Design a protein with these regions (language model features):
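Cleavable N-terminal export/targeting peptides
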Residues: 1-41, 265-274
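Transmembrane beta-barrel domains of Gram-negative outer membranes and organellar outer membranes
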Residues: 35-159, 163-167, 172, 177-274
Length: 274
């Protein structure tokens, strides 16, 4: 049944992607300025709550020059109020991500966060057929970067800038790239909070890009998504990512994305005080 739904989705992906993206832009333009920052395709500068443990599982139906599925499971740890650690696997390779939030500014119904991050993907696979630096577990990659996130009322925007490098590469394609994203999120429900147990509905539009430092190509993807949060702990995401600009030879450049997250508060032991 899932395969049938995905086939219908891909047959209509051009019309659906343009229509969905246009709908979200229209909604963002006409609703009051409000915010949310739990992005579907990128990470904000805000770290996980201290002493929390999160688990995430996602499924991607990917298409383009070829079709394939990608399953991914990740464990997330809020080591402190400033440091988060993520460990993940796509069952063909493993990755680690650490984030350090070094700046925080809070105001009434608003805040600003700045963070550094580092990421490493390790796999036996080698994507020698593409010039792009792939971040979905198809090749071993290391990277570092910077994230700036600002929230105001129920609207949040985030900018990330990073450098990524393949561990193995072909001389014909190069080895490193400049990675960037610009993400926006809007909380559309509830209109007014009465408890932490209320269901939240968020809409997102993210731009995800890469410029090869060898000068041999670049891409820019758009990724609209909808998100539901239950009891401030469980999160269901549904998104679609597609290419706006494609000047690399990626084998897959569009995907239907579904993920489920669950967060356990105060799951890690408190630090002992001397």
């Amino acid at each position: 049944m899932l395969d049938l739904v995905c086939k219908v989705w891909y047959m209509n992906r051009r019309c659906l992607s343009i229509g969905f993206c246009g709908l979200i832009i229209a909604i963002f333009g006409f609703l009051p300025t409000v915010a949310q920052e739990l992005y579907v395709f990128s990470d904000p500068a805000s770290t996980k709550p201290a002493r929390s443990i999160g688990i995430k599982h996602s499924f991607q139906k990917m298409g383009g020059n070829t079709n394939r599925n990608n399953q991914y499971t990740q464990m997330q740890f809020g080591l402190s109020k400033k440091v988060s650690l993520y460990l993940g696997t796509n069952y063909g390779g493993n990755d680690a991500y650490v984030q350090y939030r070094f700046f925080t500014k809070d105001a009434m119904y608003a805040h600003t966060r700045l963070a550094f991050y580092a990421k490493s993907i390790q796999t036996n696979r080698q994507a020698i057929h593409t010039s792009a630096v792939l971040l979905d577990g198809e090749e071993s990659v290391n990277g570092v970067g910077f994230i700036a996130t600002q929230l105001k009322h129920k609207w949040a925007s985030s900018l990330s800038l990073g450098y990524v490098q393949k561990e193995k590469w072909s001389q014909h394609y190069g080895r490193d790239a400049f990675q960037y994203s610009f993400s926006n999120g809007l909380l559309v429900y509830p209109k007014r909070y009465s408890s932490y147990g209320q269901t939240n509905v968020n809409l997102y539009l993210e731009l995800l890009g890469q410029k090869l430092l060898s000068g041999r190509g670049q891409y820019l993807d758009a990724a609209p998504a909808i998100q539901m949060i239950f009891n401030s702990q469980a999160k269901l995401n549904l998104g679609y990512r597609f290419a706006l600009l494609e000047k690399t030879n990626r084998m897959t450049n569009n995907s239907l994305f579904i993920s489920l997250d669950y967060l356990f508060f105060n799951a890690l032991p408190k630090k002992k005080t001397s």
